[in-house]
Amino acid sequence: SDVLAEILNHADGVAVAGAHGKTTTSAMISCIAAASDIDPTIIIGGEVGSLGGNARNGAGSYVVAEADESDGSFLKFYPKYAIVTNIENDHMDHYGSEENIYLAFTEFLSNVKEGGAAILCMDSPKLRKLASETTTPVISYGLEHEDARYQARNIRYSVNGTCYDLYVDGVFVSTVELIVPGQHNVLNSLGAIATAQAMGIPMQQILPALKKFSGARRRFETKGRIDGIW
């Protein structure tokens, strides 16, 4: 964690934390960034086929990393963009109380560099509370909270994946197509889109990259089909 913090803190860091979804969200951000013009460095927790692994050495200013909150080591990070997918009562062996978990994420957001932002999922009650209390600028996303800046509406599921209508600040932007299934991946993709836009990546580069994203290894990974059963 010390080496990762050293790399991220001397760059335009993008750090993804949360009880669930951080590996897939960081993988989505990584694939979008790698397909864009910004040439990022990537250090994440899951292997991604299109990246050829879980790391990439880029020449650009951005470093995308997964921030592990389980032992508090994510507080060593001072990112430009801090993404939090959710906060739950997890890792109690380290934190000891619900309040300590919340305080750790409060500190994580306070570490965001000037000119950066916290990108938070408003479907998490604790993140809604944190968004109202932090002095760090917030970019919000979600399915259930009407005040979220990035929203997915009219979600359609099929055997081929998922698609939805993307709204930003209440305005329809585009239809998003994913080949990874499930509502959780709709949320993950919203966080990735919000982050990529904050990084300056145009939507015409974001959406094609997301459409090709096939998931991170060991995250609802398709292994085969036998007698019609996947």
Task: Give the location of each predicted region.
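Phosphate-binding loop of NTP-binding sites
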Residues: 1-122, 126-136, 190, 194-199, ...
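Adenine nucleotide phosphate-binding catalytic loops in nucleotide-utilizing enzymes
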Residues: 95-102, 116, 132, 136-230
